[in-house]
Structure formats: structure tokens, C-alpha cells
Swiss-Prot record:
Species per Swiss-Prot/TrEMBL record: Canis lupus familiaris
Name used for this protein in its record: Zona pellucida sperm-binding protein 2
Record: glycosylation sites: 87, 193, 220, 266, 321, 459
Domain comment quoted from the record: The ZP domain is involved in the polymerization of the ZP proteins to form the zona pellucida.
Propeptide residue span(s): 638-715
Subcellular location field: Cell membrane
Superkingdom as given in the UniProt entry: Eukaryota
Encoding gene per record: ZP2
Length: 715
């Protein structure tokens, strides 16, 4: 921040002299009346300094008029008695006609002003006794009485503010019209000049008191530049406030800089993100201590410079505030001052970072409860910031894993049993409430390394009322009488699929399904409308027929006694059922080789119908020999392990399979029969050739004998 004073132009006058006491009296008078005075050692001069004074936070720049050449005049900083200050580290630039002097060694602090005396001496030998002294001053912009962050931008949720310390007596033009006029200039590139009334209409607000001027700037105000990095935003605008009054002009300049929503938190650190912009971080101040950038790592702050700047504050540096909204505590910093080097200026901003604390996600609904005693819950990665790592999720106090994951969709599905995985229950009136928790939390707080994983906790609840079906109950009472057990209805279905992924079966309207001889036929038998995890589907026999009738002939065996039919060269292959279905034991999957329906290079039937018999086994108490059969089954045990016809059920495909053969398929089919078919054809060929040769020989012999007999009779 800087302020600038400019007086009317003029040159020293040599017509008015005074002795030393007169100089002291008049000098004190001008100090109290105006901020710019001038006296001469040998004579008084025009009280208005003929140049411009620019007031900075820690120094003063004096610009001399161009008609005052340095070859004729020499400027130096002196004390009130006109003695040169030896410890003043001022810099005189003879080309630019400027003098720069720091407040600390070249000025005195009087009544809230930095006062400095400048002596101009004529270099002409004939006029060396002529010297003129000007008393100039700048307002104290930062005093010991001001708050900790004086000279910094104060950031709030939707605006930024800056406070100037001004010369006493300056006032708002609306409250004291005769005292002077205020103008504001924004945006260095466009240099828009606004009156205070116009600035109020364009996002600026002003507050005056006797010593300070506060400027509040909304983020969408005219001239504000916006930088963005992810969810973090940075706003900045150069400001210049100009106060013009009779005889003087004061310019207050600063650059306002602020960040919005810069903080993300996890269990180990608070991370402050600063979007990429032309400034460079110089220091960080919190807890009344200032740290240079090179010192941050040694004090628990890690710096990451990639796509902007990120400061990771260890949670050991943060304050904690107990809050009902938070899982543990809410972490925050009372204030944080960041100082940047920005376009040859030093700019500071103050933020008040705190970890946003969201309440845990709680679901209270009966829709989560399933009829078979589970809670089905979906968790999405976008439910936290940063995105939730779904691999870190756990259920309750157990290691129960999700039943389904879709990383591309950011989705995980949990199938939580009501009697396991740490599920708790409680009774409330006529309602029983089941409750569990899905969480992703750190066990140590905080760990020693930086983590970008989010904390997450979701409480899931479901309930059953008195009118609902009670499941998974355990009532200790006298054993009931033995009940009569009768087999209940069993619903099965036989389907075929395009490939071994078994994702979507063919519909009823898609039959007949076309298959070439090179293609296997993928079949599946499954149980319908049963949700008991203790039952198991077991195949008995599977076969193919040329008609819809399962008893029609001929028949081609595919599965015998629950095992592959090993009397055929083209064995059936069983496929395991993975966790993609809820009850894998309710399924049987296998494929059939189409060459099994070829005999001696001819397709036995173009339309083939498939059928299976199956039964349901109790996994806890197998009640049929087929329930524990081990493949392969020896021939002498076949049929002995069978079940009664009442226990088995026949199921057929909804339609036929249409088998088509191309020449290559048929040739491969014939070749795959092996030497048995080839040898048989070769044998038949040899026999036919031998018979034909014998017949030709016999006919030749008969003709020869008849010719010989005819010749004998003629003689």
C-alpha cells in the first residue's frame, strides 16, 4: 500500500530571509497546520513543495520537478536543525530526479505522521550560502496499536476487505463536501476511474472514521481478477484511492488479494490449496509466529507445488473444537496470514480456515430390509470430498466385504445380514430395529504420513413391525411334534446363452437358436422363486432329442447321474458359478459340443431339443445319493445312486437348437471321429474292389471257355 501527495509546481524564492529562531517558529507552525511545509536556512520559501511525495508502507519517494536540475541543486535529508542525517540510507537518482528514504532512519513520527526534512542546496559557487528546506510528511499506515494483520486483506465468505490508515481530517465526500473529493481507480490495465457513488453500484463499499478508511470488495466487483484450481478460488484487484483537496493530492494504493473455499481435510492433515497465479509465497504466519517458506517443513507444514500450491498442515498444529455435527472434533486455525511477492509488491491476505464438518449419513427406512434377512445398501464414491476410496470401506466391527463393486460407476453394494457382520438390534414398542455402520476411518489419529483419503461413516437402519414377517428368530422352547414331510412344488428352468459369460439368456421368441457345428451350446439350469442358501441344485440326467417329446428316440446323452457322459468323444463341460449371482448353489451351468450330434459325416438332426432332470438337495442334511455324488461315477454304480421319480423334475428348453454345417465344420467333424470311421470306410472300399475284380475274372473265364468250345465244334 502506498499514498501519494502532490502539490502545486513552483521554484524556490530568494527574496525572503529569516534568522534561526524565526525558522523554528514558522517550521513548527507549518507542521501543525499542513502536511507539507518548506523553509529555507537563509530565507523562507513557498510552503508548497514543488514536487510529488509518494507514501509507501515503509518508505517515502520524493519526485522533484523537471525544471530543477541536479547540476544546479543538491538534495539531502536533514534534521530539524538543518544538519545532515548520517545514518539515513536515502538513495538519490539524478536521472529520474527521485529521492527514496526509509521511514525508520530518515524520519520522525509525530502525531501519526512520518515527518522528514529535505534540504535543497544551490551548487553554484556564487550561491552556496543559499539553501532551502522543505518539511514533508506521510501518514503512518501501520502503527503498534493496530491489529495483528494490519496491511493485509481480510477474507470472508463472499468478500474481501482492506483498511487504510489516513491523515486525520480526511473524510468522506458525502459527510464533508468541502473537505475534498474522493475518486477510485481500479484495474491497472483499463484504469477505470469511479466516484465513490459509482463504486458502490459496482461491488465496492466504504467505511470512514477519523483515522481509517475500510474498503470492502465483493468477489464479483468491477476489476476483480479470478483464478481457479479445482474447488479453490483466488480473487485479486489493484486499488487506487485518490483524495484531492485545495493545495494537495493524496493517493492511496494497494493490491487486494483473497482466497475462497481453499481447505480440504482428512484424518491426518488440513490441506490449503492456492490456485496458480503470478504471485509467489514468501511467508506464512499463524499463532503470532512468522515462518519463511524454507522453514515450513521443519514446523509441520508440507509444501506441494503442482498445478498451483498446496500447503498440508499437520493436525497437531490445529485447534480442536467439539461439535455435535462432527465425528470426532472440528479442526481449525484461528487465523492464517499468507504473504506473497506479486508484481513487484508485497501482498498479504488473512484467511480463517476450518474443516467443514458434515453430519454422518444416516438412513432410517424399512425399505432396506429384505424378506430373507438382509439389508441392501449402496455407497457411491462421490459422497465425500475428496472422492471416497471404496476399497477402504468396512461393515461394523467385522471384515465383511461388499457383494458387488463397479469402479467405473463409483458404486459399491453391501448385502448385510441381520444376524451377522456386527449388526445390532433393539426393541422399541412393537418394532425391532436393526442397525449397522459402514465406515472408512483411520485407526490412528493422525498417522505420520500425508493421506488424501476421506473419512466416511454411514449408519444404516431398518426395522420390522409387529405386522411384518418375522425372520431369523431363535425361540428356545420344547421341541414340536414330528411333522409329516411331503415334497413341495419345485420350479426349474432350462435356458441357453450366447457365450460362457452367462449374462443374458435367449428369450422365448428367439428360438430356434442357430448354431454351427463348430460352436458349443451353453446351457443353464436354475431354481426359481427360492431364497434358501442351504439348498443345492443337482443334475441327474440331460439328453437331446429330435422332437419336443423328452421320451422320443433317438436320444443323445449329455449328462448321466450328474456327471459328464464319458461314452462320447465330445464330453460335456461344466462351468463354475461365480459370485455374480446371489445363490450360486441354485445354478448348474455346462456346455455341449455340437459334434456330438454327427454320425459318419452326417448331421443326425437339424433341430435338436434339450431336456434335463434335476432335484433339490439340503446342503446341511443330504437326503439323496445324488446329493453327494463324486464324478466320474463307475458304471456298476450307475442308476443305483438315482432318486425316486417323485423327487426329480424334468425341464426342457423353450425351443429347439437349429444345427447348421458348413463344409469345413463337416470335414473337421469327420476327421475328429478318428481312425475308427476312416478305417471302416477304407475296409468297405477294399471289399468292393476285390468283389468287382473277382466278377470280372469269372466273366472273362466264361467267355474264354465258350470261344474254345465253338472252335472245337467247327473242326
Amino acid at each position: 500500500m502506498a499514498c501519494k501527495q502532490k502539490g502545486d509546481s513552483g521554484s524556490p524564492s530568494s527574496r525572503f530571509s529569516a534568522d534561526w529562531s524565526t525558522y523554528r517558529s514558522l517550521s513548527l507552525f507549518f507542521i501543525l497546520v499542513t502536511s507539507v511545509n518548506s523553509v529555507g536556512v537563509m530565507q523562507l520559501v513557498n510552503p508548497i513543495f514543488p514536487g510529488t511525495v509518494i507514501c509507501h508502507e515503509n518508505k517515502m519517494t520524493v519526485e522533484f520537478p523537471r525544471d530543477l536540475g541536479t547540476k544546479k541543486w543538491h538534495a539531502s535529508v536533514v534534521d530539524p536543525f538543518s544538519f545532515e542525517l548520517l545514518n539515513c540510507t536515502s538513495i538519490l537518482d539524478p536521472e529520474k530526479l527521485t529521492l527514496k528514504a526509509p521511514y525508520e532512519t530518515c524520519s520522525r513520527r509525530v502525531l501519526g505522521q512520518h515527518q522528514m526534512a529535505i534540504r535543497l542546496t544551490d551548487n553554484n559557487a556564487a550561491s552556496r550560502h543559499k539553501a532551502f528546506m522543505y518539511q514533508i510528511s506521510c501518514p503512518v499506515m501501520q502503527t503498534e496499536e493496530t491489529h495483528e494483520h494490519a496491511g493485509s486483506t481480510i477474507c470472508t465468505k463472499d468478500s474481501m476487505s482492506f483498511t487504510f490508515n489516513i491523515i486525520p481530517g480526511m473524510a468522506d465526500e458525502n459527510t464533508n463536501p468541502s473537505g475534498g473529493k474522493w475518486m477510485m481507480e481500479v484495474d491497472d490495465a483499463k484504469a477505470q476511474n469511479l466516484t465513490l457513488r459509482e463504486a458502490l453500484m459496482q461491488g465496492y463499499n466504504f467505511l470512514f472514521d477519523s483515522h481509517r478508511l475500510s474498503v470492502q470488495v465483493s468477489f464479483n466487483a468491477t476489476g476483480v481478477t479470478h483464478y481457479m484450481q479445482g474447488n479453490s478460488h483466488l480473487y485479486t484487484v489493484p486499488l487506487k484511492l485518490i483524495h484531492t483537496s485545495p493545495g494537495q493530492k493524496i493517493i492511496l494504493t494497494t493490491r487486494v488479494l483473497c482466497m475462497s473455499d481453499p481447505v480440504t481435510c482428512n484424518a491426518t492433515h488440513m490441506t490449503l490449496t492456492i490456485p496458480e497465479f503470478p504471485g509467489k509465497l514468501q511467508s506464512v504466519r499463524f499463532e503470532n509466529t512468522n515462518f519463511r517458506v524454507s522453514q515450513l517443513h521443519n514446523h509441520g507444514i508440507d509444501k506441494e507445488e503442482l498445478n498451483g500450491l498446496r500447503l498440508h498442515f499437520s493436525k497437531s498444529l490445529l485447534k480442536m473444537n467439539s461439535s455435535e455435527k462432527c465425528l470426532l472434533y472440528q479442526f481449525y486455525l484461528a487465523s492464517l496470514k499468507l504473504t506473497f511477492a506479486f508484481e513487484r509488491d508485497t501482498v498479504s491476505t488473512v484467511v480463517y480456515p476450518e474443516c467443514v464438518c458434515e453430519p454422518p449419513v444416516t438412513i432410517v427406512t424399512g425399505d432396506l430390509c429384505t424378506q430373507d434377512g438382509f439389508m441392501d445398501v449402496k455407497v457411491y464414491s462421490h459422497q465425500t470430498k475428496p472422492a471416497l476410496n471404496l476399497d477402504t470401506l468396512r461393515v461394523g466391527d467385522s471384515s465383511c466385504q461388499p457383494t458387488f463393486k463397479a469402479p467405473s460407476q463409483g458404486l459399491t453394494l453391501f448385502h448385510i445380514p441381520l444376524n451377522g457382520c456386527g449388526t445390532r438390534l433393539k426393541f422399541k414398542g412393537d418394532t425391532v430395529i436393526y442397525e449397522n455402520e459402514i465406515h472408512a476411518l483411520w485407526t490412528d489419529l493422525p498417522p505420520s504420513t500425508i493421506s488424501r483419503d476421506s473419512e466416511f461413516r454411514m449408519t444404516v437402519k431398518c426395522h420390522y413391525s409387529r405386522d411384518d414377517l418375522l425372520i431369523n428368530t431363535n425361540v428356545q422352547s420344547l421341541p414340536p411334534p414330528v411333522a409329516s414331510v411331503r415334497p413341495g412344488p419345485l420350479a426349474l428352468i432350462l435356458q441357453t446363452y450366447p457365450d460362457k459369460s452367462y449374462l443374458r439368456p435367449y428369450g422365448d421368441k428367439e428360438y430356434p437358436v442357430v448354431r454351427y457345428l463348430r460352436q458349443p451350446i451353453y446351457l443353464e439350469v436354475k431354481v426359481l422363486n427360492r431364497a434358501d442358501p442351504n439348498i443345492k441344485l443337482v443334475l441327474d440326467d440331460c439328453w437331446a432329442t429330435p422332437t419336443m417329446d423328452p421320451a422320443s428316440l433317438p436320444q443323445w446323452n449329455i449328462v448321466m447321474d450328474g456327471c459328464e457322459y464319458n461314452l462320447d468323444n465330445y464330453r460335456t463341460t461344466f462351468h463354475p458359478v461365480g459370485s455374480s449371482v446371489t445363490y450360486p448353489t441354485h445354478y448348474q451351468r455346462f456346455d455341449v459340443k455340437t459334434f456330438a450330434f454327427i454320425s459318419e459325416a452326417q448331421v443326425l438332426s437339424s433341430l435338436v431339443y434339450f431336456h434335463c432332470t434335476a432335484l433339490i438337495c439340503n446342503r446341511l442334511s443330504p437326503d439323496s445319493p445324488l446329493c453327494s455324488v463324486t464324478c466320474p461315477v463307475s458304471s456298476r454304480h450307475r442308476r443305483a445312486t438315482g432318486s425316486t421319480e417323485e423327487e426329480k423334475m424334468i425341464v426342457s428348453l423353450p425351443g429347439p437348437i437349429l444345427l447348421l454345417a458348413d463344409s469345413s465344420s463337416l470335414r473337421d467333424g469327420v476327421d475328429s471321429k478318428g481312425h475308427r470311421a476312416a478305417g471302416y470306410v477304407a475296409f468297405k472300399t477294399v471289399v468292393a474292389v476285390a468283389a468287382l475284380a473277382g466278377l470280372v475274372a469269372a466273366l472273362g473265364l466264361i467267355i474264354y471257355l465258350r470261344k474254345k468250345r465253338t472252335m472245337v465244334l467247327n473242326h
